Amino acid sequence: DTVYVTIDKAAVRKSGMMMASDSIPNRMVISLKGKNALYKGDLMMLEMIAQSNWVRPIYVASTVGQENYMNLGDNFVQEGLANRITPFTTNAPGAKNFDTQKTYNNVMNRYKYGGLSRKGIYIDETVMRMCYTHRRIIAQLALHLISEGDKQKANKVLQKAEKELPAYNIPYNYMNGGLDIARAYALLGQTAKAKEVANAVWINAQQYLNWYLTLDGSRFANSMNDCMYQIYVLRQAASVMGMADKQTAAQQEKKLNMLFKQYQEKGGAMPMGDE
């Protein structure tokens, strides 16, 4: 249930890909575990990997479902909106799977944001999902830059996000990386911005939870998972708020406890495994 591809190390060095580990492996390991059959698309991808010799990069869009690229996620290095297939096993301890330099260049210089900063525009669901994807990637990039000690670039990335994906058109929430943005601001010492973004995520989740708590009978019963999700988001938002304003975080924790009590009083159950 494993395929091996012999690696031309010189070709890998010339390819321009990020070296995900200290040494280039002698062979690429592709696990086929869990697959009962290989279809034409799978065989085509394996053939491309075997024949390309790393001269031409092979990418998989970050929005593509796992079922469409076998188990090659073990070999991905993220370069913004695309995952580059590499000969490295990037999910191994100590390996890198995020190319900060290429992602920074993509976000700052190559991506076109299509006028999303213009006030009053209508953003449909499909475009909004892509906005969410872009903001999540920018948040990831900022946190990676901070972890690498490049706070100046991290700040530029956050400014870019605020300019191109403004909150007045794309409100902050948990799904679009709002808390990672807030966390990055906090780590940069910009506590006012961190508080603003974390609070926006909190308010969004609280509004949803308040609405679910107005439901009765089967409608409430069918919404329990959604309630628990919003409670989880509120807990995470309060935690990030604690990095910027401990007093506000304490108030949010108190409010969260009250909301959770309301949920239980309406007959809300804990998820399986948490009881």
Language model features with spans:
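ER/secretory pathway lumenal C-terminal domains and tails of membrane proteins involved
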Residues: 1-275
